Structure formats: C-alpha cells, structure tokens
Regions:
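Acyl-donor-binding surface of acyltransferase catalytic domains
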Residues: 2-27, 133-236, 399-405
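A generic N-terminal leader/anchor concept
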Residues: 2-10, 15-122
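A short beta-loop-alpha structural element at the N-terminal edge
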Residues: 35-47, 232-247
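A conserved beta-strand-loop-helix scaffold within acyl/acetyltransferase catalytic domains
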Residues: 52-94, 102-112, 235-340
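Acyl-donor binding region in acyl/amide transferases
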Residues: 111-194, 199, 313-390
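Active-site proximal loops enriched in glycine and acidic residues that flank catalytic Cys/His/Asp
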Residues: 290-291, 300-306, 338-344, 355, ...
Length: 407
C-alpha cells in the first residue's frame, strides 16, 4: 500500500520556544524539516533494515538481527505473512539522511476473528527526536485510518511470534532473541504522542536449581505414574526433531487461540519458522510428550543465549558468524525458553513437570545457571504462578501501546 503524499513537518524555526525545545534530541541533524517516504526499492529496504545499527551503535545491550533472516522477513515473496495483510514500510528523512523508520500492518484475518478494527505499527526506530517520531506515527495513523481502522497498537508485527512491545523495565539486562531492545526515550516518544498501555508482557529470570529440589522430583514421579503410556521424548540430533515440527506447531495453533496477538501458523509458515530457528537450537533443549500413537500432547523448546555471538558477528552468519553464534549458545550460562504448549485435555496432569524436570536436567548438564522465561502475558496467571514456584522473578517488562484514531 502507498502513502499518497510525502508528509513534510515544519522547521523548528516556525515553532514557538516551548515547541522548539521539545524537539531537541540526540541526533545532530535536528533543525531540518522531516519528510516521510515509502520504501519502494532495494536500497531503501537496506536502509530500513540497517538503520537500527546506527541508532544503537553505543547501546551495550542491543543485539543486531541476523541480517539474512531480516532480508527474508521483509521479502513478500519469502514471508507468507505479507499475503494476509496490508503493509507499508516508511522511512523518515532530514535532508538526504535517514533518521527513522516504522512499519504499518493491517492483519485482516486477525481483525475479523477478534471483531476489531486495529492497525499495527512495528519496527519503530528513531533517535531521541520527537519531531521525527511524530512524523512517523502520524503517517501510520493516517494510513490506518484510510483503511477504516479505529485504533493503532504496537509495537506488534504479524503475530506474537515476532518481537513485540517496548521494554519499559530491565534496561540493564541483555536482549534475547525475538525480543525488542530499546532506549527509554522511545517509550517517552510514544506517550508524548498520546499512546498509552494496551497490554504488558513480563519476563521471568529463574536461577536453575542444582540439584533439582526433592519436592519437584516427587511431583515428577507422581505425574509419570498417573500418565502411564506417555513419554517425554529427548533429542541429540536435529534430524530426529524434524518429523515433529509440524505436529508441535499444530498443537501450538490449537492451544494459543486466545493468546493476545497470536496468529496460527500456516503449513508454509511452519517450514519458515523451522528454517529460521532449528539450526540455532541445541536439540537437547527440545522436550516433547507423546502418547502411545506418537501423537504430540505437549512440548517445550529452549535455546542457549546467543546474544554475545550475534553481537560479535554484527548479525552476519557467513563466513564464520554461525560458528561464533553456536559457540555463544554453548558457552552462555543462560537458557532462554522460546515456546511451549500442552494439549487442553492434558492440562493439570503434570505434563509440565515431566518436561520441566527433563529440561532442568539438560540445562544443568550443559552448564546453564539461569533461565529466561521469554515474554508472558501479564494476565497469564497460571504460567506466572509456575514461574514463581520455581523462584522466578520478573526482571523485564514490555508494553504494547495503543491509541484511538480520530476522524
């Protein structure tokens, strides 16, 4: 979709003193007017993808994306999510220099299923410059309004499987894969433009107990007795994981229907997801519960922290980046949970403990000392209770913002 005109925002010299002072930011080109243009060619897409590296060049905890993945993500012929949505990529300019970016998304199927008229923004990046931020947000709001939307929320991309929300607590902690890393000023920029809380997501950090507490082992033993005929599959080879990829993600589709922002995987997206992550995951951190017919009833997937490896390679896999990333995952003392689900008919029967003990055993064997829960919805009290039983504490909080659109 196309923005019909390039928006131009006034020079600070045309503002009163208080307004001019409000747009003072950290970028040296403050004072120039802002123009907004749509990404239409490969050069502009390159600028869109690589702008965050300039903004975050002195940001110690920021982890670049894996650029090979990023190029495929923004390629409509490779990323099937584009087929279900209206999208737009915008760049902000001061003079000829790119100073900001944002993506707009309208997910028609999600809106229909949830009876909503909400547009989304994602991949919002600027220096600390309210003038640029307002120009980008205004452009997305106008675009969404033009498509009949009544509200804009974000950061939220195609689904909850993509990085979502802005960090509002835990700025001193390192970023993990598939999560956003932002400066505090980005939160201020949104709030000053009228955005407020839509939804919070929390992340727990758990100290991995060694040895595993006796009470947890007793619960595991009881669960095994009560679930005769079920077994926890463990893996040492990615090749042996592959036959379970589609069954695992089909289970996710069935169990995540009420999760905020979740969009079911299509068959093609299942393959894309596997290609994107499987080579990075130590198969020892994949646990799957099956019944006697080898049907998947539950699963959990973890990954060694790879942030330092990606930082070292600057987001490049080749020629040697992949080795640094895999070494980082092995050497890291932190295990990051990625996904997990239990068939609704088997909830409350101890399958979580059966998998959990096996995961803790693998984590201890691999030298892990802490566990990151990944993002959990603040109202998901059941999962949060389980994390807290293990001594977990919230150490990061992310917020998805929203704003009503006026006619």
């Amino acid at each position: 979709m196309v923005v019909k005109s390039i928006l131009k925002y006034p020079d600070e010299s045309t503002m009163d003193d208080s307004a001019a002072q409000a747009v003072q930011g950290d970028h040296p080109m403050n004072g120039l007017p802002v123009t907004i243009g749509e990404v239409k060619d490969s050069k502009q897409l390159y600028q869109f993808i690589h702008l965050p590296a300039a903004i975050h060049k002195d940001h110690f905890n920021w982890v670049p994306p894996i650029y090979m993945d990023e190029k495929e993500f923004f390629n409509p012929s490779k990323n099937k999510c584009f087929q279900a949505c209206d999208t737009i990529l915008l760049l902000a300019y001061k003079g000829k220099e790119v100073v900001g970016r944002i993506m707009g998304i309208i997910h028609h199927q999600y809106n229909t299923d949830h009876k909503e008229k909400k547009g989304r923004f994602a991949f919002f990046e600027t220096w600390n410059d309210p003038q640029v931020a307002k120009a980008l947000l205004d452009a997305i709001e106008d675009w969404a309004r033009g498509h009949g939307m009544e509200r804009v929320i974000g950061p939220l991309a195609f689904s909850d499987k993509d990085p979502q929300g802005l960090l509002i607590e835990g700025f001193d902690e390192p970023a993990v894969i598939a999560s956003n890393c932002n400066f505090p000023y980005q939160v201020d920029l949104l709030e000053k433009d009228g955005y407020s809380k839509e939804m919070d997501l929390v992340v727990y950090q758990i100290k991995i107990p060694n040895p595993i507490p006796e009470f947890y082992l007793k619960i595991q033993e009881r669960a095994i007795r009560l679930n005769a005929g079920l077994q926890v599959l463990e893996f040492t080879s990615r090749r042996k994981v592959k036959p379970y990829i589609h069954p695992v993600l089909h289970l996710l589709n069935r169990t995540f229907t009420e999760i905020f922002g979740f969009v079911p995987f299509s068959e093609a997206e299942m393959d894309d997801f596997a290609n994107r992550y499987l080579f990075l995951i130590n198969p020892r951190f994949i646990k799957i519960v099956v019944n006697g017919q080898n049907e998947v009833l539950a699963f959990v997937i973890g990954m060694g922290h790879i942030g330092e490896g990606i930082q070292k390679t600057k987001g490049k896999l080749f020629p040697f980046g992949i080795f640094h990333i895999l070494r980082s995952a092995k050497k890291s003392k932190q295990l990051n949970l990625l996904l997990g689900a239990i068939d609704p008919d088997y909830r409350g029967k101890g399958l979580d403990v059966m998998m959990g003990v096996k995961m803790l055993e693998s984590a201890i064997a691999q030298g892990k000392m802490t566990l990151d829960s990944h993002l959990e919805l603040e109202y998901n009290t059941k999962v949060r209770s389980e994390m807290e039983k293990l001594g977990g504490e919230v150490y990061k909080r992310f917020r998805i913002f929203g704003k009503n659109l006026k006619e």
